[in-house]
Amino acid sequence: MKEGKDGFVRADQIDLKSLDEQLERHLSRALTLEKNKKKDEEDTTAVAIGGSASSSPVTLNGGGFVGKRKQRLEWEIDPSKLIIKTVLARGTFGTVHRGIYDGQDVAVKLLDWGEEGHRSEAEIVSLRADFAQEVAVWHKLDHPNVTKFIGATMGASGLQLQTESGPLAMPNNICCVVVEYLPGGALKSYLIKNRRRKLTFKIVVQLALDLARGLSYLHSQKIVHRDVKTENMLLDKTRTVKIADFGVARVEASNPNDMTGETGTLGYMAPEVLNGNPYNRKCDVYSFGICLWEIYCCDMPYPDLTFSEVTSAVVRQNLRPDIPRCCPSALAAVMKRCWDANPDKRPEMDEVVPMLESIDTTKGGGMIPNDQQQGCLCFRRKRGP
């Protein structure tokens, strides 16, 4: 496996499709073993010292039955140690629950492959591939601004949902990702709660720095997140931002032509992505610029425009969110550099970090609350470049 001149491993040489197929084989093997579990247990318990079926079963080191043991992958959890509790969030393809794993508070992302007839075979294959890719990316990451990955399971028995009437067994085709539980919830929800009163400038810069450091780390690991938005950022109890949801992340190709396709969320997507052009990690930098504006303003970009209007305006008219006049010039400069239409003119995330660190937050500069905005033209219904 060769590296490009910039040290980035080519995605086409890593072959994520092969990785997904490899994980699929592990899943198939696990399901086969599950089906044969009863037969294996009967075979092992029937073997006894002296050849009598009624004798004590053969043991090793006094520890248990002789039999086949499935060797777990390094990222696989033990389903028997997982308790799934209340729902935290619901999405198109699954739910996020609060839970306990091996005595630790966790968040559990559940995906149902949909073998019950609700989805087509192609959709199921796509979901499995997304799940495998997310696990492959996430389990190797270790940074204070990235949500800690604990483990996952791709279709296993033993999962139980705790209800008021007692434990409820989950279907065997349910797959899950287990990560640390972050009580602060999504950054987006935090911003919505502060939409009227806004955030102090010190908090704005702290949140932005957390996100910038997390993205800088991902890029140092040759990972492009591709869906950077405040909804995918979580807060711990100390209000530290941690990046989550690696469902569309992938290893960056040294050749941008190897990375194409409209991936991301409207309002945060870079022009080159919206236009279907090749892109690289700089698409994350663009999305960070939009997030930075959102953190400062506690508002949504382009709330009154449709998908087609945003796509056309961002690509053809250089549409960007209005920067309030009360925004300190140093922070506004970071926004403008990050969302530059030319990816080559955007800074690297490891450059953005010191830019934010150098901003003086001791003299205020936060967004003016809604009831004090007479002297600050903070928003217009029609946003321009």
From Swiss-Prot:
Binds to CBC1. Associates with PHOT1, PHOT2, BLUS1 and PM H(+)-ATPase (e.g. AHA1). PROSITE patterns: PROTEIN_KINASE_DOM, PROTEIN_KINASE_ST. SMART domains: S_TKc. It comes from Arabidopsis thaliana. Keywords: ATP-binding, Cytoplasm, Kinase, Nucleotide-binding, Phosphoprotein, Serine/threonine-protein kinase, Transferase, Tyrosine-protein kinase. Residues 82-356 form the Protein kinase domain. PANTHER family: PROTEIN KINASE, SERINE/THREONINE-PROTEIN KINASE TNNI3K-RELATED. This is Serine/threonine-protein kinase 52.
